[in-house]
């Protein structure tokens, strides 16, 4: 009687994981050497990720939960914060997809890359949500700043979370924009 193979093929031991991980790190370093601006992509993604967490940690520590973070800015912003958090994870995964030994992530990335300007759309969506958070924060607190466009005024409130998120989006977008414009920074 033949011994049964387990279904789903979960059985193969992955002995080359450490080697693949090392190769992945070398691959990533090569990617950064090729264009030093590439490091900004992942730094930016981390900033967006931290935008929802650092201010929350700070606020929890000081016992102030309203002002600081995307989760609480403007009352019920948890929805925005969670979306921004998830999208930042997508951005991080996007950057490491080519360098980690997980074919599923690489496959998904390949499919998404077929969508023109997918990365810009992703960053744009994050930007819009952060903008909404900024405006909601402005209206939720008396110290919001009013910015006037002709006769229309709009109140915005700057919180640490929002600043982190904007910095992250700008950092993640910069190399992509330069790339699209064909501007190369670094030793080519």
List where the protein language model places each region:
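Cys/His-rich metal-coordination motifs, chiefly Zn-binding "fingers/knuckles"
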Residues: 1-5
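Compact integral membrane and secretory-pathway proteins
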Residues: 8-188
């Amino acid at each position: 009687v033949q011994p049964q193979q387990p279904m789903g093929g979960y059985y193969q031991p992955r002995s080359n994981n450490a080697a693949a991980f090392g190769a992945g790190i070398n691959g990533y370093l090569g990617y950064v050497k090729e264009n030093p601006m590439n490091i900004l992509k992942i730094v930016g993604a981390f900033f967006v990720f931290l935008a929802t967490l650092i201010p929350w940690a700070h606020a929890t520590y000081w016992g102030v939960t309203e002002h600081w973070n995307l989760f609480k800015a403007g009352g019920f912003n948890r929805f925005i914060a969670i979306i921004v958090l998830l999208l930042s994870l997508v951005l991080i995964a996007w950057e490491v997809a080519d360098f980690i030994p997980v074919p599923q992530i690489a496959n998904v990335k390949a499919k998404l890359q077929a969508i023109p300007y997918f990365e810009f759309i992703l960053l744009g969506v994050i930007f819009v949500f952060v903008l909404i958070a900024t405006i909601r924060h402005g209206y939720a607190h008396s110290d919001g700043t009013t910015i006037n466009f002709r006769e229309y005024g709009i109140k915005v409130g700057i919180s640490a979370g929002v600043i982190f998120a904007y910095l992250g989006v700008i950092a993640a977008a910069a190399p992509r924009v330069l790339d699209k414009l064909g501007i190369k920074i670094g030793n080519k």
